[in-house]
């Protein structure tokens, strides 16, 4: 085992040889082929921050790591966290690749470093360091002993090994690998890498602007009986109905509206999944106004079977991510307000707050169904009360006893829903007694099913995606809802 003086000397060599990339905003470009299509890849690093964008025919999706948590980003650059937890693995990967583990203050701020037995590769001995930044996972970095450059990242526990190959000078200041392999397979081959003088920017998404204070909007009453939150809106000079749908991962519009606005699909085929599946296109539509909130022009998925439901636009994750949206079911109103900056007061959420996570840009919360805790998607676009994925219900048939079945329809197709009721559902700090419950075959569910507007109609619900929570207020005098002591 090497002495601490030897380890310190190695860290100095590594910092000098690499040029300390953690001090710079680095932009890299590459390409990859998937499914017969070519994608332009752009990756950016700035200290521990990391951003990746994959683009084809002008449409991009991506990934973002803010130094603590990881986020997925959709076509409209809306980013939502993959988990509420700190991503310890990303922290350590970024600390090694950026050489932040060589920074003089790395151990002062809580990072841990120790040297393990050297490894032999093709007859050569390499130094092996166990590295764990503050709040990071433990990974091993393999260093070339003379220069100190990182040539590998290894996790025996996770059974993977990265190789950092083809090390080159970038802009005369830093040394970076141009090829990265995982378990022997090349996963990234950079064509260009450069230092950018401006800071790395986080994904912004669609930030609404407001003409005055928050405005209360009356819901539109549909011809059919429905608790769905549908409100009037305008886009491209057309007045249409918009559904506020937390079960939608972005934005959608009817084929009829796209044709009326004379906007053509671009970016190739897009797969739509609901009760069925089909392939459609994506259009770029102009700004949309709802109440006194205006969202900028954006990408919309075109749905050919949307208009019969009574609306032409579906406002999903993109409309919720950068605003506070209150759907007051008892009063049949919607209010959209600025989300506001996150500050120290957010460490103490209101008493009626319910934590949410996200799966495919859909909010998920844990609900107590009888005696079972079940993660369910909060889906304002689903007309049902509680709609379980059939596979989950088949594995847990004791949740409810079926009393009938009914045909259901949705985007992409039709199905059958087994129906019944359940004695009690715990949602946040409320018990809802004897709500309807069902299980639908072929339901493309997030979580283990959906809480729909048929259940949410007991409450005024404020969705605050930026704080990963919703806030519940029960309708006064509702005998089916009981506050939990």
Task: For each feature predicted by the language model, list its residue ranges.
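A cross-family detector of function-defining hotspots
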Residues: 31-35, 116-120, 272
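Pepsin/retropepsin-fold aspartyl endopeptidases
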Residues: 41-44, 48-53, 77-79, 86-92, ...
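N-terminal beta-strand motif that seeds the catalytic metal site of vicinal oxygen chelate
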Residues: 138
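Structured N-terminal alpha/beta-domain signature
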Residues: 11-16, 25-27, 70, 114-115, ...
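N-terminal mature ectodomain segment of secretory-pathway/periplasmic proteins
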Residues: 1-77, 208-211, 250
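A short, amphipathic edge element
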Residues: 24-26, 101-116, 160, 281
């Amino acid at each position: 085992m090497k002495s601490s003086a030897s380890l310190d000397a190695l860290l100095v060599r590594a910092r000098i040889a690499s040029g300390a990339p953690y001090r710079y905003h680095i932009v890299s470009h590459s390409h990859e082929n998937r499914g017969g299509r070519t994608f332009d890849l752009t990756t950016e690093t700035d200290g521990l921050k990391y951003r990746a964008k994959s683009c084809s025919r002008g449409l991009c999706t991506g990934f973002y790591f803010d130094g603590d948590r990881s986020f997925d980003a959709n076509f409209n650059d809306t980013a939502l966290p993959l988990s509420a937890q700190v991503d310890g693995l990303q922290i350590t990967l970024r600390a090694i690749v950026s050489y932040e583990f060589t920074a003089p203050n790395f151990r002062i701020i809580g990072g841990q470093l120790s040297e393990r037995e050297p490894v032999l590769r093709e007859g050569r001995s390499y130094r092996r360091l166990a590295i764990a930044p503050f709040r990071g996972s433990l990974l091993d970095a393999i260093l070339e002993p003379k220069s100190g450059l990182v040539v590998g990242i290894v996790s025996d526990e996770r059974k993977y090994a990265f190789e950092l190959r083809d090390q080159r000078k970038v802009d005369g200041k830093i040394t970076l690998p141009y090829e990265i392999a995982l378990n022997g397979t090349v996963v990234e081959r950079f064509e260009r890498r450069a230092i950018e003088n401006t800071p790395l920017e986080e994904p912004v998404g669609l930030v609404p602007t407001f003409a005055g204070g928050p405005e209360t909007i009356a819901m539109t009453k549909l011809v059919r009986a429905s608790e769905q939150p549908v409100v009037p809106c305008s886009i491209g000079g057309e007045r249409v109905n918009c559904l506020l749908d937390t079960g939608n991962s972005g934005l959608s519009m009817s084929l009829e509206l796209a044709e009326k606005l004379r906007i053509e699909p671009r970016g190739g085929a897009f797969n739509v999944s609901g009760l069925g599946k089909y392939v459609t296109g994506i259009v770029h539509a102009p700004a949309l106004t709802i109440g006194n909130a205006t969202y900028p022009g954006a990408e919309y998925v075109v749905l050919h079977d949307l208009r019969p439901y009574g609306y032409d636009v579906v406002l999903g994750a993109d409309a919720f991510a950068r605003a506070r949206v209150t759907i007051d079911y008892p009063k049949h109103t919607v209010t959209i307000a600025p989300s506001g900056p996150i500050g120290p007061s957010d460490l103490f959420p209101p008493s009626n707050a319910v934590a949410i996570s996200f799966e495919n840009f859909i909010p998920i919360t844990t609900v107590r169904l009888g005696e079972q805790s079940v993660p369910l998607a909060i889906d304002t676009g689903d007309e049902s009360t509680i709609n379980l994925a059939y596979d989950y219900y088949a594995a847990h048939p004791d949740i409810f006893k079926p009393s009938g079945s009914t045909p259901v329809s949705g985007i992409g197709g039709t199905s059958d829903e087994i129906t019944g009721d359940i004695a009690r559902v715990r949602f946040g700090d409320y018990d809802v007694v004897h709500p309807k419950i069902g299980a639908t075959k072929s339901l493309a569910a997030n979580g283990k099913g959906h809480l729909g507007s048929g259940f949410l109609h007991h409450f005024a619900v404020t969705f605050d995606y930026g704080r990963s929570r919703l806030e519940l207020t029960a309708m006064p005098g509702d005998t089916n809802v009981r506050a939990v002591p």
